[in-house]
Amino acid sequence: MSQETLYFDDLKVGDSFTTGTYEVSAADIKRFAAEFDPQPFHLDDEAARNSMFGGLAASGWHTAAITMRLLVTGGPKLANGVLGAGGEIAWKMPTRPGDVLHVESEVVELTPSRSRTDRGMLVLRSRTINQHGEVVQDLTARLVVARRSA
């Protein structure tokens, strides 16, 4: 992934980006869950084994936070940062201790703003994938992206 700063005008439908990786540990899962999603199957190995997950699983919100980190640190370097305007998220399967995640993203839509000519709306589809090639999260995000000065 190039570290070139990208403006709305630089992007094309079909452009793709791949991030670096992030390894998830059991301690990470429990630490995040203790603060933000304190459900037994995220906090306790025994409770997790007896849950529908059959073992310790990261909160979906933890997976989403990892995805955001990977996009910000290794995804497309957007001129104004990653400014979200909504989207849809689906968790396809649990993120487990030891998973090594990366994100693959594709530009699926670009719409110049009619009312604010200094920006446009980017629809970016990002799949968070583990070391086995399995999609653990699917995110379609609408992002506000700055245009180049006229």
Predicted regions and their residues:
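HotDog/MaoC-like acyl-thioester-processing domains
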Residues: Q3-V13, W91-A150
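Short, intrinsically disordered/low-complexity patches at protein termini
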Residues: F41-L43, V82, G87-E88, M121, ...
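Short, charged/polar low-complexity linear motifs in solvent-exposed/disordered segments
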Residues: F36-D37, R49, V82-L83, G120-L122, ...
